[in-house]
Amino acid sequence: MGTIALLRLDTMILDIARHKFYEGIITLLITTIVMIILLATSAGDSGIASAPDSPLMSLISSATFGSGFVEGLITVILYIVSTLTLSRSTLRTHIYTADTMAPIALCSVMLLPMITTGDALHQAVVVLLLAHAMANMFYCFSHRKCFHRLFAAMVAASTLAVVDASLTIVPVTMALALIAARKKLREAVAVVVGMLLPLFAYCYIAWLQDVSFSESLLLWWRSLVAPLSLNILDNLKLTRLIFIAFIVFLQATSVILHLSHREIHSSVMRGSWRTMQLMFVASLCCALLLPSASDSLLTVVVMIASAMLSMYFINSSAMLSVVSYVALASLAFAAAI
């Protein structure tokens, strides 16, 4: 399994390198170094409120790997793989061109303040699952035969709801968007089965441990509706609050920019953007209104926004792109400290 994982990572790096994304790789490496330093210096510092005991939350949070160094290393590896996965899919589906450097560079810096918040390993798992869900979702709009992509996207998205019940809105909105886009019964069945499979697997594993299916579902439902002791906004540092508010503002303006040039965009980009807009708005509303909203919801909001902010770099000049990116990166680093 380790060899397969390394080969997959090498394939992603080489695929991005063929598109002349060296700047993005360098950015990712620099951001990773900063992330390692932040994880080492802020161990145990919970930036915002912790999430409730959802099905797999306690397992991930209590996981021990012998030392904090190993846990930090695993977190960094998940962070790198997630960024490369999302960036590679935007290139191969032609959502963004190879000249835009933005997908890999933006994802790496925009996620930095969220990964280094609270339980870093849990946040890295959420980012990894969402990256695979979004990557497979992009392929669903670019290929006629995408049965396996539909299934893989929904399995990854639905696993988010098992990891953290407050993220249930992600698979629900993605499923509705994919069913509406594909409009075929066979593919709708694949979406529904993929969405239910992770929850069934969790209930089955709990059943093997003498916990009934109904009790497992009841635990998941309580995790979804049970309020946190602290609202995520009440315990949010000012720098991260400013960062998230600014990202939400930029995402809203990027939608206007996308709609103003909609006729020149491909059908793949239009379909992907509609789905990301739906997921972004739904996740943001849940983060503000859902009693059980955890910090993972804010991570989802920032990650979806980072994939959409690349719109700013498509037609902008090189100088403006550099200045804008440096400003965004500076804000992200300041929010992560």
Where are these predicted regions, by residue range?
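Aromatic- and kink-enriched transmembrane "portal" helix at the membrane-lumen/periplasm boundary
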Residues: 105-124
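Juxtamembrane membrane-water interface segments that cap and precede transmembrane helices
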Residues: 51-66, 217-241, 255-258
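Perimembrane helix-loop-helix junctions
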Residues: 170-196
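Membrane-interface alpha helices of multi-pass inner-membrane proteins
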Residues: 149-163
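Transmembrane-helix signature of polytopic, membrane-embedded enzymes
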Residues: 90-110
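Transmembrane-helix motifs of polytopic, lipid-linked glycan transferases
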Residues: 77-93
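Membrane-interface transmembrane helices that cradle and orient dolichyl/undecaprenyl
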Residues: 133-148
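Membrane-water interface signatures at transmembrane helix termini and the short loops
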Residues: 258-317
